[in-house]
């Protein structure tokens, strides 16, 4: 079983695979007891194995995730989906904790800083730790088409478009690495994908950088505390319900 760190640190409040939370605990107390040391997202072996198998079966993971992707967490946090969150977390943490739990789950993946700035801040204040799960480099949409990855800005203009080839890179995160076949690809030279798909986990997780060494750790280097998360642009309500339920169930059910 692979444990994937997504955001960090919500142990006593039973956010993200924590323990000890009960439905009778006041929300205010729960939030104040949040720690900054044990946040893990634990994916089920079945889901993860299926995602990895899809890539292998097709000969290449990248070719199996074709589509256009937007940032995940701005979509997850839209007001129209709030009740889905509340309905999902209430059975696990109680109605009195549902709002605070939802805010915390979302907030731990929506930090506005990463890299050395984040490392310095979190070293001084571990309880403030969170991950930046936004797209970087001005990209608002990623288009995956076979071996080609394209990034578009807010106006739909192309920022980059390169063909990528798979690499065999051993890394602590279990990510799948790709390298641009074009010279001077800048911060889009290397991509590292978690073996997710819209069919299995209803989202993608990936990182990219000019230096492959920056993609080896979530907690060190120029991209520390950054892990981009995307969802298919044409997702529907059922997909949104599925990803929220999966996220909540895998991160809170152990507290039951």
Predicted features along the sequence, with ranges:
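Positively charged n-region of N-terminal signal peptides that target proteins for export
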Residues: 1-10
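Bacterial N-terminal signal peptides
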Residues: 9-18
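Polar/charged side chains located within well-ordered beta-strands of beta-rich proteins
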Residues: 14, 69, 203-207
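Bacterial lipoprotein signal-peptidase II cleavage site
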Residues: 18-30
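Intrinsically disordered, low-complexity serine/threonine-rich repeat tracts
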Residues: 27-53
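N-terminal helix-cap/turn-to-beta initiation motif at the start of protein domains
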Residues: 52-70
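Short, solvent-exposed loop/hinge segments that bridge or flank secondary-structure elements
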Residues: 59, 70-147, 189-199, 256
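Calycin-type beta-barrel ligand-binding domains and close structural analogs
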Residues: 122-256
């Amino acid at each position: 079983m692979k444990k994937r760190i997504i955001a960090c640190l919500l142990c006593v409040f039973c956010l993200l695979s924590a323990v000890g939370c009960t439905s009778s605990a006041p929300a205010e107390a729960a939030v104040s007891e949040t720690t900054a040391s044990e946040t893990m997202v634990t994916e089920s072996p079945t889901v993860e194995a299926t995602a990895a198998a899809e890539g292998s079966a097709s000969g290449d993971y990248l070719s199996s995730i074709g589509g256009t992707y937007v940032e995940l967490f701005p979509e997850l946090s839209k007001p129209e989906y709030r009740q889905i969150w509340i309905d999902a977390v209430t059975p696990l943490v109680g109605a009195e904790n549902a709002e605070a739990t939802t805010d915390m789950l979302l907030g731990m993946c929506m930090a506005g800083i990463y890299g050395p700035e984040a490392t310095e801040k979190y070293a001084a204040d571990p309880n403030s730790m969170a991950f930046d799960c936004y797209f970087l480099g001005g990209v608002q949409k990623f288009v995956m088409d076979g071996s080609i990855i394209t990034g578009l800005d807010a106006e739909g203009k192309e920022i980059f478009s390169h063909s990528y080839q798979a690499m065999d890179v051993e890394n602590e995160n279990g990510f799948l690495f790709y390298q641009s076949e074009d010279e001077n690809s800048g911060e889009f030279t290397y991509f590292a994908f978690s073996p997710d798909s819209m069919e299995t986990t209803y989202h993608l997780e990936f990182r990219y950088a000019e230096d492959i060494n920056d993609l080896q750790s979530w907690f060190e280097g120029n991209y520390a505390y950054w892990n981009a998360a995307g969802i298919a642009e044409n997702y529907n309500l059922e997909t949104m319900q599925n990803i929220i339920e999966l996220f909540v169930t895998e991160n809170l059910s152990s507290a039951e």
